[in-house]
Amino acid sequence: MIIRSPEPEVKILVDRDPVKTSFEEWARPGHFSRTIAKGPDTTTWIWNLHADAHDFDSHTSDLEEISRKVFSAHFGQLSIIFLWLSGMYFHGARFSNYEAWLSDPTHIGPSAQVVWPIVGQEILNGDVRGGFRGIQITSGFFQIWRASGITSELQLYCTAIGALVFAALMLFAGWFHYHKAAPKLAWFQDVESMLNHHLAGLLGLGSLSWAGHQVHVSLPINQFLNAGVDPKEIPLPHEYILNRDLLAQLYPSFAEGATPFFTLNWSKYADFLTFRGGLDPVTGGLWLTDIAHHHLAIAILFLIAGHMYRTNWGIGHGLKDILEAHKGPFTGQGHKGLYEILTTSWHAQLSLNLAMLGSLTIVVAHHMYSMPPYPYLATDYGTQLSLFTHHMWIGGFLIVGAAAHAAIFMVRDYDPTTRYNDLLDRVLRHRDAIISHLNWACIFLGFHSFGLYIHNDTMSALGRPQDMFSDTAIQLQPVFAQWIQNTHALAPGATAPGATASTSLTWGGGDLVAVGGKVALLPIPLGTADFLVHHIHAFTIHVTVLILLKGVLFARSSRLIPDKANLGFRFPCDGPERGGTCQVSAWDHVFLGLFWMYNAISVVIFHFSWKMQSDVWGSVSDQGVVTHITGGNFAQSSITINGWLRDFLWAQASQVIQSYGSSLSAYGLFFLGAHFVWAFSLMFLFSGRGYWQELIESIVWAHNKLKVAPATQPRALSIIQGRAVGVTHYLLGGIATTWAFFLARIITVG
């Protein structure tokens, strides 16, 4: 008789048909809330509808139901992303000069939008050369397509159709996993399985498949393109996969197949998996063979990482154990209890993810110019400026979002009775020390960084240049930054003797790389001017953090309002009889933090734009003489406030201000319109609610006189609604103004 151990029971992790699909339900506005579903009495109803539609916490307190809604919404989000991507690829296929650009990327500008002549606006179709007229694009899609080996508009069509299919699939998945097979709460909370799948699947296999695509498709096609072969003559992607000899002609090790891999003679593959460093002198981008090597290495790391956590087989790490083992001499219970927080509060989890992703996005912004990954990206100055600006703004918004959700967690999900002496509790108990020290740091940075500029403006005004802080008078060299630059420039000699250059040309030491008579990249010098503006960066970042962190740490209570947690995440004031308690809610801290985030990012993108035009971007003569766009004026002009106003804002705005009557006139209109949108925001930010309510009532009286009064009573915006509308227009107007200013400038001079 054979005695078997009992088979482990398979856990059923989904519920079948939990919520019936109902079109009637969808068609009823506010079906998620009893109050809103009754329909409008006053115009406040439409605001509440928008505020609460996606606030799943307010629909139900059942964590499983909330998790399912969030999960389903993610599929909807992915569907929109695929739809957007499909549109981008379709424009590339139908309305662009991609094939012409591919044949001569140094002289022909990328365009994927042609304006139809309806009321004379075909003036916007500028000459991008190569016999094509259209709007010059600065999204970097052409460069990505070339890097991935797309050689024809037909391939773009096929990809666009593929993305549409995926968009439909995602929509279906969103419906299916909410209405047909909805995961149980235990599935959402199984962090080890989630880690294994995301690490090994998404990041590991994702990187591996991309590395495979790069080796088998991108590398050979780009090799041909770099050699000047006509795109129409280049073999199609599937031919390299079916015919190994094609690849072996370009990369001899392919002839040996997998033998070197299994005999551990891996160096054989060094002809297509390289470690060179620096930039490809033909395209001004990173070596694609370096990039393929990088993705292969990343894939191996993540495939290993994806097998580290304990699931059904009782081996590996458990996340709870890891967290609870973290105890230092000064941290009490350490991370005890964090596991429970992060598996029961999606706001806490989201907050961490947003903080990480926001920081990562800003890192991406800096790498896109210092290590330009795609061919001909570095010499497309408009795209370089757009990519930097875009990733900086996105990073800023994500980091503010991190603070917002941390505060929502504190108000809605934090349970002080079960949290004693763990790290979070200890941070909350000495929050006064944290905030007051941070406040001191902000004051110090603000006065000193601004004071250096004011000193320079004063000395400049008095005609005493010898007494200014500058590279030619009193020097304040950024010695630590210069030391880091130097170390990185010299590092490959010691750490990677096989590499021909350092990770980035910006560190120094190397020569400049020029493509088609334009600078792709060169060593970036840092001096007194950078030292000054870096301290402005430090100041604005610290103030943003001060506002956001104060909002989180005082979200539940403060000396002023001890019962703040009962008032919720957003409230205007603590009742009419308590003066001086307005703008204290966690929501208001996010509101105020957004303005400082805007300040911080604005200074960064202004610094970048001017620094690159002054010290990096420009043309190279046949004799090798570099002429920068603004002739190196950053070091002497940006050391005074007046210099920033006169030589950056005013001098470089001439293109957008004078754009009327040219193909850039849309930027002139946007510049004007976005200024208006920004100014319009002030009407909401400085408004008094009572003033508008009085005005509304006299307008309603007039409507009643004429018997045209609506059934829904008009109401003035609440204090919070006014602030929300105000900050939205402030940011939208400011960002669109900057966008028009940057693009009109760089498309003209770049």
Swiss-Prot record:
The protein's matches in Pfam families, at most eight in alphabetical order, are given as: PsaA_PsaB (PF00223)
Native species: Atropa belladonna
Q: Which Gene3D superfamilies match?
A: Photosystem I PsaA/PsaB
Query: Which branch of life, at top level?
Result: Eukaryota
Q: Keywords for this entry?
A: 4Fe-4S, Chlorophyll, Chloroplast, Chromophore, Electron transport, Iron, Iron-sulfur, Magnesium, Membrane, Metal-binding, Oxidoreductase, Photosynthesis, Photosystem I, Plastid, Thylakoid, Transmembrane, Transmembrane helix, Transport
Q: Name one GO cellular component term.
A: chloroplast thylakoid membrane
Q: Which NCBIfam families match?
A: psaA
Where does the record say this protein resides? Plastid, Chloroplast thylakoid membrane
Q: Name one GO molecular function term.
A: magnesium ion binding
Annotated membrane-spanning segments are 70-93, 156-179, 195-219, 291-309, 346-369, 385-411, 433-455, 531-549, 589-610, 664-686, 724-744
Instruction: Tell me how the cofactor is bound.
Output: P700 is a chlorophyll a/chlorophyll a' dimer, A0 is one or more chlorophyll a, A1 is one or both phylloquinones and FX is a shared 4Fe-4S iron-sulfur center.
Q: What does this protein do?
A: PsaA and PsaB bind P700, the primary electron donor of photosystem I (PSI), as well as the electron acceptors A0, A1 and FX. PSI is a plastocyanin-ferredoxin oxidoreductase, converting photonic excitation into a charge separation, which transfers an electron from the donor P700 chlorophyll pair to the spectroscopically characterized acceptors A0, A1, FX, FA and FB in turn. Oxidized P700 is reduced on the lumenal side of the thylakoid membrane by plastocyanin.
**Alphabetical GO biological process terms:** photosynthesis
SUPFAM superfamilies listed in its UniProt record:
Photosystem I subunits PsaA/PsaB
Query: Which EC class, in a word?
Result: oxidoreductase
Give the residues the record marks as binding chlorophyll a': H675
E.C. no: 1.97.1.12
**Primary location group:** plastid
This protein's name: Photosystem I P700 chlorophyll a apoprotein A1
Q: Which InterPro entries match?
A: PSI_PsaA, PSI_PsaA/B, PSI_PsaA/B_CS, PSI_PsaA/B_sf
Subunit relationships: The PsaA/B heterodimer binds the P700 chlorophyll special pair and subsequent electron acceptors. PSI consists of a core antenna complex that captures photons, and an electron transfer chain that converts photonic excitation into a charge separation. The eukaryotic PSI reaction center is composed of at least 11 subunits.
Give the residues the record marks as binding chlorophyll a: M683, Y691
Q: Per UniProt, what is the membrane topology? A: Multi-pass membrane protein
The similarity annotation says: Belongs to the PsaA/PsaB family.
